[in-house]
Regions:
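Conserved N-terminal glycine/acidic-rich loop preference
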Residues: 109
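As written
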Residues: 116-117
Length: 190
């Protein structure tokens, strides 16, 4: 039971509004989950972290407002078009900026916090040192500690493909593999 484990927040993905969710929820499902979670003193945050095209942004803005009216405690976003609309409606205090790749330093994080947001999520694709630097200088940040979600959600066999294309010899199931970019000193777990 998650409550016994100390879980105090549930993050849900809104249908058609994220690119990294394993399951997406409808408005009616979100409403039911909010009621259940609030009964157990847990907060509910909805993920709307995709970037929207010109033809989709206005519908997404309206949907964001509808989701917030379902009683959720917050909403995670990536598209500045959602922030613009939220500011017009005085809803920015419910928002958490959650870019998957667009924030790379504490100045980025501080900029988003200065927009009146609830929080920012430090991207899990950064190195541990980069994450720690951003968290050190930016108050009220969220750090994802369970690993790189984007690669795992994609279900692509990236290590196997790399091994085959580059004719390398290593165990793709090894727990000790890491990646190193040319311009960074730190290693990232694979």
């Amino acid at each position: 039971d998650y409550i016994d484990l100390g879980v105090n927040e549930v993050v849900l993905a809104s249908a058609d509004n994220t690119f990294s969710a394993l399951h997406e929820f409808t408005g009616e499902e979100i409403k039911e989950i909010v009621e259940e979670c609030h009964m157990h003193h847990m907060t509910v945050t909805v993920l709307m972290n995709r970037l929207y095209s010109e033809k989709d942004i206005y519908a997404a803005q309206k949907e964001m407002e509808e989701i917030l009216h379902l009683g959720v405690d917050g909403l995670m976003f990536a598209d500045p078009g959602l922030l613009k609309y939220a500011k017009e409606k005085h809803l920015e205090c419910y928002l958490t900026y959650r870019p998957e790749t667009l924030m790379t330093c504490n100045e980025d994080a501080l900029f988003w916090k200065e927009q009146g947001l609830r929080s920012v999520v430090i991207p899990c694709l950064l190195t541990k040192d980069e994450v720690m630097d951003i968290a050190k200088y930016t108050p009220d940040t969220t750090v994802i500690i369970h690993g790189s979600t984007l690669m795992s959600v994609s279900k692509r066999k990236l290590l196997s493909a790399y091994k085959q294309v580059n004719q390398k010899d290593f165990d793709v199931h090894s727990k000790t593999l890491s990646l190193k970019e040319k311009q960074r000193e730190a290693y990232m777990p694979a």
